[in-house]
Amino acid sequence: MRHDRALRRKTGFRLLLGGLAALMAGPAIAQSCLQPAERTAFDVRALQSKLMVAALACSRDAEYNAFVRKFQGELAASYRGIQGHFRRTAGNAHQRELDGFITQLANAHSQDGIRAGSQFCPLTTPLFELALAQTNVEGLAQFTQERNVLNPLTTPACPAAAPAAPARPRPGQRPAAR
């Protein structure tokens, strides 16, 4: 009997600790997800990285420079969005995480080019003209997704906020007329 009580107390304590851990992890999980504006920023950065690798590998400096000039503001805003994501999710290690991601992104595009071999330039150089045809950051992000531009980011999207529930009428209060 005494043994059963001790076992129940231990089990109850473990359940309490598990519940507290889950409560504490909730905000951390929410912090590590990707906001919609951050998703756009990461997509734009992936396209920029793909075009940068293509410019270097395929001697398309003029096209890349035209892309950077046209979208200078959007590219800078996207970089700031990525910085903000890593500040939010990595705290004091944000700069190291940001640098690591940008390096990983460039390496992924470079490896993609190596795998494509002699087909890389013919397949990639049309992207310059198509990217330059976009008019804003949303167009660039959509273009990136439509073209399946490689992005090694695995962070899940944040869940959408639930819509607010309508207020309940107080007892004795009649519903509003429609």
Regions found by a protein language model. Name each.
Residues 2-16:
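Bacterial N-terminal signal peptides that target proteins for export
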Residues 15-23:
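Sec-dependent N-terminal signal peptides
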Residues 25-27:
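N-terminal signal peptide c-region/cleavage motif recognized by signal peptidases
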Residues 34:
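Active-site flanking loop/helix segments enriched in acidic
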Residues 37-95, 103-107:
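Short N-proximal segments of mature Sec-exported proteins
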Residues 74-177:
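Compact alpha-helical subdomains of small soluble proteins
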